[in-house]
């Protein structure tokens, strides 16, 4: 078995799927760790091509020899809620001003999408987590 590479950094970014460019914020974040920025952009864009239009978080692990690996996550819950509700942004005063409503069915779809990245064991628990995020954005849930 080959010796393990030593990890020097773990970088977390949220980038639009298929639209990674060396411009900020990606360039400076990777450049300070000596990563080949164009190589990352090409690999990320290829990996997220099917998810265009979504913000896809990525966790980049940088090794001692300046090589890297990355893992893409599911889009943020807030982004999925905004897309499902058809709104630009959440409420400025979420508990006073409601900006949209979601049905239980939409909530279940978002929960199933996010399930791999949430610390929930079943869809019901994931739904509660997503409902809490929606509530803090000024989005109400209807049955």
UniProtKB/Swiss-Prot annotation:
Post-translational modification, as annotated: One or more lysine residues are methylated.
SMART domains: RL11
The keyword Metal-binding is assigned to this record: no
Gene Ontology cellular-component terms listed: cytosolic large ribosomal subunit
A Pfam family assignment: Ribosomal_L11
InterPro entries xrefs: Ribosomal_uL11 (IPR000911), Ribosomal_uL11_bac-typ (IPR006519), Ribosomal_uL11_C (IPR020783), Ribosomal_uL11_C_sf (IPR036769), Ribosomal_uL11_CS (IPR020785), Ribosomal_uL11_N (IPR020784), Ribosomal_uL11_N_sf (IPR036796)
Range of residues in the leader sequence: none
Keyword DNA-binding: no
Assigned protein family: Belongs to the universal ribosomal protein uL11 family.
Matches recorded under HAMAP family: Ribosomal_uL11 (MF_00736)
Name of this protein: Large ribosomal subunit protein uL11
Gene designation: rplK
